[in-house]
C-alpha cells in the first residue's frame, strides 16, 4: 500500500519579534531567515521547505503584522496579509508572557474573515512557567476558532516535532513542489545579504534603523570566499555610523 504524500503552504504570522524566523529556522534545521530584536526585521515573504517521507511543507515567513507607521510598513503589512487566504494553514505565534493588547486585537480582527485553519502556537515556553503557558491558553482560546493550540520553544526546539506532525494532519494530499534537497527559494546572494543585515542590526543596535538594505557587489565561490557588499540606510545622517 502506497503511503499518502501530503503537501501544502503554511504561513507564520504574529507580532514583531515573537520568534517567527527562529521557528522557521528550527523547523528546517538551517538558518535562512534572519532574527533581530528590532521590529519587522523580516522584509519580504521568505519561503523555506521542509520535506520528509510524510510530505512537504512550504513555510512562508512574513513581516510582523502590526499597524503600519510609514510606506515601508504599509508594504510589509500588505505582504503579510496577502498570504492569509492563499495558504493551507496559518500558524499564529504568540508569547505566553504578553497580554492580549492592541497588537493582538489587530491580528484577531484580520483573522476573523479568514477561512484558512489557524493554529495558535505559544512560543518561548523555555522562558515561561507552566502556569504562564496555561494562562495564555485560557486567554487566547476563545479569541478565534483555533484548529489546534500548541506550546513550543522555537529556540530550543521543544515540541516542534509535534507541531510538524499536527501540520501534516491538516494538509491535503499533493505533489512535491520542490525537490527533496531544496530548503529555500531564496538565492544564495540574498541569503548572504540578509545575514550581513542581521549583523549590522545587532552590532550597530540603535544607531542604524531597520530601514537598512544590503547589496552584494561581489561574491567569489572559493575557499575563504571574498564578499564585497554595500549598506544603504534610509537617512543620509546614518552613513558615518557604520564606518
What are these regions (language model features)?
Residues 81-146:
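Conserved C-terminal guanine-recognition region of P-loop GTPase G domains, centered on the G4
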Residues 39-41, 63-66, 96-100, 125-128, ...:
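Conserved nucleotide-binding/hydrolysis micro-motifs of P-loop NTPases
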Residues 159-221:
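C-terminal end of P-loop GTPase domains and the immediately downstream helical coupling element
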Residues 40-45, 63-86, 97-109:
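Switch II of P-loop NTPase G domains
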Residues 128-182:
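Canonical P-loop GTPase G-domain recognition
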Residues 2-67:
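Conserved G1/Walker A P-loop phosphate-binding module
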Residues 232-237:
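Conserved small/polar residues in nucleotide/adenosyl-binding loops
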Residues 97, 104, 115, 125, ...:
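RNA-contacting regions in translation and RNA-metabolism proteins
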Amino acid at each position: 500500500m502506497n503511503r499518502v504524500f501530503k503537501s501544502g503552504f503554511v504561513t507564520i504570522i504574529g507580532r514583531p519579534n515573537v520568534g517567527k524566523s527562529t521557528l522557521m529556522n528550527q523547523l528546517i534545521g538551517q538558518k535562512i531567515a534572519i532574527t533581530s530584536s528590532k521590529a519587522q526585521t523580516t522584509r519580504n515573504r521568505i519561503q523555506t521547505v521542509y520535506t520528509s517521507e510524510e510530505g512537504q511543507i512550504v513555510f512562508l515567513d512574513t513581516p510582523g503584522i502590526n499597524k503600519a507607521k510609514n510606506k515601508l510598513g504599509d508594504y510589509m503589512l500588505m505582504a503579510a496579509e496577502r498570504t492569509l487566504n492563499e495558504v493551507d494553514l496559518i500558524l499564529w505565534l504568540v508569547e505566553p508572557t504578553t497580554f492580549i493588547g492592541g497588537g493582538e486585537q489587530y491580528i484577531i480582527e484580520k483573522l476573523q474573515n479568514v477561512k484558512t485553519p489557524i493554529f495558535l502556537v505559544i512560543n518561548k515556553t523555555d522562558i515561561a512557567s507552566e502556569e504562564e503557558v496555561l494562562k495564555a491558553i485560557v486567554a487566547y482560546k476563545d479569541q478565534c476558532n483555533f484548529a489546534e493550540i500548541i506550546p513550543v520553544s522555537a529556540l530550543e526546539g521543544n515540541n516542534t516535532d509535534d507541531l510538524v506532525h499536527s501540520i501534516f494532519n491538516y494538509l491535503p494530499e499533493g505533489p512535491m513542489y520542490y525537490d527533496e534537497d531544496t530548503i529555500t527559494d531564496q538565492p544564495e546572494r540574498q541569503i548572504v545579504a540578509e545575514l550581513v543585515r542581521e549583523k549590522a542590526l545587532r552590532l550597530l543596535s540603535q544607531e542604524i534603523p531597520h530601514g537598512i538594505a544590503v547589496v552584494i557587489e561581489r561574491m567569489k565561490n572559493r575557499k575563504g570566499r571574498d564578499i564585497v557588499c554595500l549598506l544603504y540606510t534610509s537617512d543620509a545622517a546614518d552613513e558615518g555610523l557604520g564606518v
